[in-house]
């Protein structure tokens, strides 16, 4: 199943997980040292939702991120869907 948001286009990003040792300078130590770096993925907070579309007069089942759900609450589903179609998501 795709991990891409249908409304905002958010998808997994790549980054690093750092292994750190030492005592921080805030605690009067010498400072934190990075001892290892491992590749990892940052996944978007995805969920499948049934949302009511007033223009189409039916439920739409969408796989969206939490950020997209907040956007739907703010602007309304029909505006967000129109914006997503214009951007090509």
Swiss-Prot record:
Belongs to the bacterial ribosomal protein bL28 family. The keyword Transcription does not apply. HAMAP family: Ribosomal_bL28. One of its GO terms (biological process) is translation. SUPFAM superfamilies: L28p-like. Gene3D superfamilies: Ribosomal protein L28/L24. Keywords: Ribonucleoprotein, Ribosomal protein. GO terms for cellular component: ribonucleoprotein complex; ribosome. Pfam families: Ribosomal_L28. Signal peptide: none annotated. Disulfide bonds: none annotated. NCBIfam families: L28. GO terms for molecular function: structural constituent of ribosome. This is Large ribosomal subunit protein bL28. It comes from the Bacteria. InterPro entries: Ribosomal_bL28, Ribosomal_bL28/bL31-like_sf, Ribosomal_bL28_bact-type, Ribosomal_bL28_sf.
């Amino acid at each position: 199943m795709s991990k891409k948001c249908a409304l905002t286009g958010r998808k997994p990003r790549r980054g690093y997980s750092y292994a750190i040792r030492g005592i921080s300078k805030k605690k009067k130590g010498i400072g934190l040292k990075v001892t290892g770096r491992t590749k990892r993925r940052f996944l978007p907070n995805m969920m499948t939702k049934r949302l009511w579309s007033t223009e189409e007069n039916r439920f739409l089942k969408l796989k969206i991120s939490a950020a997209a759900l907040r956007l739907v609450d703010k602007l309304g589903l029909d505006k967000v869907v129109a914006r997503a179609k214009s951007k090509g998501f």
